[in-house]
Amino acid sequence: MSAVINKETLQAKIAEALKAGKPRRFKQSVELIVVLKGVDLSKPENRINLLVELPHPPKPNKIAAFAHGAFEVSAKNAGVDSIITRDQVEGLSGNKRAIRKLAKQYDFFIAPPDLMPLLGRVVGPIFGPRGKMPEVVPPNVDVKSVVERLRKAVRVRFRNEPVVKVRIGSEGQSPKEILENALVVLEEVNRKFPLRQYLKDLYFKKTMGPPVKVRAVEALVK
């Protein structure tokens, strides 16, 4: 991967994005936008939806667990931010406003396999399109290790076009740290769609800042 990406150029563009725009009263996130070309999204095999663990997460993600019984105990011991019981899930049925609010409140959700049919029915229609469906934790998997991984993770996926938008940093982080986060995301995209063939453009931008464009010819080593 390091042989494909021009790291010096990307780090300079990240520094430019950090300086661009007016100062704000809050710490802005830094987003990576990857625009691909020649990807036919009508083919299911061309879709991306995966988790990538960042080496320098801008902040710990908030995680909630749909849980009951032994899994509830394990989730509490793993330090999740909230427990949502089976009864609470059933109480959400038909309440689209409450489900949308819940989806916004947490970055990731976890659940045991036996709750997934209920969750698919109650929250699936709203969680699914938002990329918020729970990560299923099988009985033989350590819940704490899953939570620790999700604290540092971002979801890399396509929506309705071959574009990936991912938060890779925030103001206060160095361009080098943000670059290293960007590289792990680009590496995963490159596994599925070799960037030399599919990359059109990259962009870096702060929450309220202008996008800084990186053309493919600049982003890739010749």
From Swiss-Prot:
One of its GO terms (molecular function) is structural constituent of ribosome. GO terms for cellular component: large ribosomal subunit. One of its GO terms (biological process) is translation. Keywords: Repressor, Ribonucleoprotein, Ribosomal protein, RNA-binding, rRNA-binding, Translation regulation, tRNA-binding. Binds directly to 23S rRNA. Probably involved in E site tRNA release. Belongs to the universal ribosomal protein uL1 family. Part of the 50S ribosomal subunit. This is Large ribosomal subunit protein uL1. It comes from Pyrobaculum aerophilum (strain ATCC 51768 / DSM 7523 / JCM 9630 / CIP 104966 / NBRC 100827 / IM2). The gene is rpl1.
